[in-house]
A protein has these predicted regions:
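Glycine-rich, aromatic-flanked loop segments that form ligand/cofactor-binding clefts
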Residues: 91-133
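Short, acidic/polar
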Residues: 148-160, 216-217, 353-360
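Structured C-terminal cap/extension of enzyme domains
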Residues: 1-58, 347-407
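Hydrophobic faces of well-ordered beta-strands that scaffold small-molecule active sites
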Residues: 124-130, 166-170, 200-206, 227-234, ...
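Catalytic alpha/beta core domains of metabolic enzymes, predominantly
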Residues: 237-384
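Active-site mouth loops of central-metabolism enzymes
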Residues: 12-37, 42-44, 125-154, 179-182, ...
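Acidic (Asp/Glu)-rich catalytic clusters
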Residues: 160-164, 192-197, 218-225, 245-254, ...
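Glycine-rich, proline-tolerant flexible connector loops at the mouths of alpha/beta enzymes
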Residues: 136-141, 164-194, 198, 204-210, ...
Length: 407
């Protein structure tokens, strides 16, 4: 076979393929010398011309926004199923006591100062500490009370008339077996003198010894019958020693309120409350969940108080009690009073600031009653409470106004 024939054989399939794809063949510069030209097309798929694609115009770029989109905002407000019980401290003559006024704490139905949900029914209050025996106090405090430190009644009167105490706390430290081991009768006599000196409600503080406190509280409850004093405090240690029942019965029989103290443990707080329910109605119980000072565990105190209040609002009946803070514990922090470097000065203000910050932190966690010491700290905390309470109920859509608020 010649080269020309071989080339023709190789070309034939290519021609057929082009004819199948394009439907036509255009030959240029080709000379064909034939007698007869025969083309055979084998049966197959019909020849279809490729579709023509229409030209697509390029999309115009999106326009830049000229204003912020408007959207409706519905502020979230919440109703809580629980409510903190109200507790009345002190009793007027019409109620069997001799106080010139009473103090009501508790009653919250929303978290502390959620004014856009509901304003607190009663403002938090401040009690000033008084001691029945000489105790070591920082100079910053002694400056204000030096003349009355040996007279609890005069000290209480100064706290009310000069420093604006809503309540007076009388700490009966002289009853401590390791200090003076004063008798319950002598302690009760001190309480009588304080009740005659002032007309505000009274908190009676023990020495911390369960056995001695139990005997003192029973005697004080009898002597101060009808005055609705707050006995501070009853503990699970008393229960374990078999002393709690006697104190609770004395409080019930003589018309007083008890302070249930536990150390940063809600389960133990609930257990103590359950034991007290056997003798006392809920409106005769206040809780002390422990106050740790700024720099010494304040964040733990804040958390436990906040958890207790939210549990109460969400319906836990065993935590629906007003809460007391022993804010004077701030002075246990050595930074509040000891001599330090110049960056810590002025020393006379450091302690009051320490006590104030401790109180304000727990105020926002829901504390209803503060035990305090320094007059400047007391005044500052009362002013803050007054400002917050004066706002009343606010509209939910204005909850961010604090960003531009001026004090």
């Amino acid at each position: 076979m010649g080269k020309e024939e071989e080339a023709a054989i190789k070309l034939s399939p290519k021609l057929l393929e082009l004819l199948r794809k394009l439907g036509e063949i255009e030959l240029r510069d080709v000379d064909i010398e034939v007698g007869d030209l025969e083309i055979w097309l084998q049966p197959g798929a019909p020849l279809v011309a490729s579709p023509k694609v229409a030209a697509v115009a390029a999309a115009a770029p999106p326009k830049k926004p000229t204003k912020i989109l408007e959207a409706e905002f519905t502020p979230l407000t919440q109703k809580y199923p629980g409510r903190v019980v109200e507790v009345t401290l002190g009793a007027t003559k019409g109620k069997g006591g001799s106080r010139g006024k009473t103090v009501v704490i508790g009653g919250a139905t929303s978290p502390a100062f959620y004014l856009f949900e509901e304003a607190p029914p009663h403002p938090p209050v401040v009690a000033l500490d008084v001691f029945d025996t000489e105790v070591p106090l920082p100079k910053a405090i002694k400056t204000y009370i030096q003349e009355v430190m040996e007279d609890p009644a005069a000290w209480a009167k100064l706290a009310v008339e000069k420093f604006g105490a809503d309540i007076v706390t009388v700490h009966l430290l002289s009853t401590d077996p390791l200090i003076q081991d004063a008798s319950p009768a002598k302690a009760a006599k001190t309480i009588e003198e304080v009740l005659q000196a002032v007309d505000v409600p009274i908190i009676v503080g023990g020495c911390g010894d369960p056995k001695k406190d139990a005997s003192v509280f029973k005697k004080v409850a009898e002597v101060a019958e009808g005055e609705r004093v707050l006995l501070s405090s009853v503990t699970l240690d008393m229960a374990e020693a078999g002393l709690l029942d006697g104190v609770a019965k004395a409080a019930k029989d003589h018309g007083h309120v008890v302070l249930a103290f536990t150390a940063l443990d809600l389960n133990r707080a609930k257990e103590l409350n359950r034991r007290l329910y056997e003798f006392l109605p809920k409106d005769r119980i206040v809780m002390d969940l422990t106050t740790a000072a700024l720099g010494y565990g304040l964040e733990y105190s804040f958390t436990i108080h906040e958890r207790a209040r939210m549990a109460a609002l969400m319906g836990d009946p065993e935590l629906q009690h007003p809460v007391l803070s022993g804010t004077t514990n701030a002075w246990a922090a050595r930074e509040a009073w000891m001599k330090m470097g110049p960056e810590w000065e002025p020393r006379e203000l450091r302690g009051p600031v320490w006590e104030t910050v401790t109180a304000l932190a727990l105020l926002l966690a829901g504390v209803d009653l503060f035990m305090m010491m320094h007059p400047v700290a007391v005044r500052t905390v009362k002013e803050v409470i007054g400002q917050l309470m004066s706002k009343g109920g606010t509209k939910p859509e204005k909850i961010a106004d604090w960003v531009t608020a001026k004090m």
